[in-house]
Amino acid sequence: CSQSRGLGDVYKRQLLLVNHDGKVVQGDKDVNVAAFAIHSRLHKARPDVNAAAHSHSIYGRTFSTLGKLLDPISQDACAFYENQGIYKDFSGVVEEVDEGDEIAKALGDKKVAILQNHGILTTGPSVDIALWFYMSMERCCQAQLMAEAAGKPISVSHETAVKTREFIANDIAAWASYQPAFDKIVKMQPDLLD
């Protein structure tokens, strides 16, 4: 999409198809330069990633200011255990693809990244999967912020975190978990796919 919009305000007809040089192939709006700088380089570095979700949501953005990874303090947080990168070189609005390259490098082969002082980014082989990981990560950021405000959270063991991650963080589980949210969105906005 060419402009920043809430997910509830995006329709299929507003989407742009952009080539690797930033030229609009389909659609009639201008390209969001910052989005192109991040997403184009991410897709170039990670051909397995068909979708990436990123916004400046309140809990992800707040958690990103801590400059650290999510801890495995809950079952849901275990989905991101040893599966998150961190980009610590925030220098304002991303305008150059070189910074997009650095963000892709920080993500590495992981599913998600924390962009320090900026927000969170999640990936997947489909939009559904990337969005599910985004929604889940946002809630995990919220939970860890609340837990740390209340005291010192206790992490689960490495073995438990790995076992839990393998069970809940696979693409099939993520896709299936997102379907009720998608159904609700389509029910609320039947013209979404127009």
Q: Can you say where each PLM-predicted feature lies in the sequence?
A:
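Structural motif
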Residues: 23, 50-53, 60, 78, ...
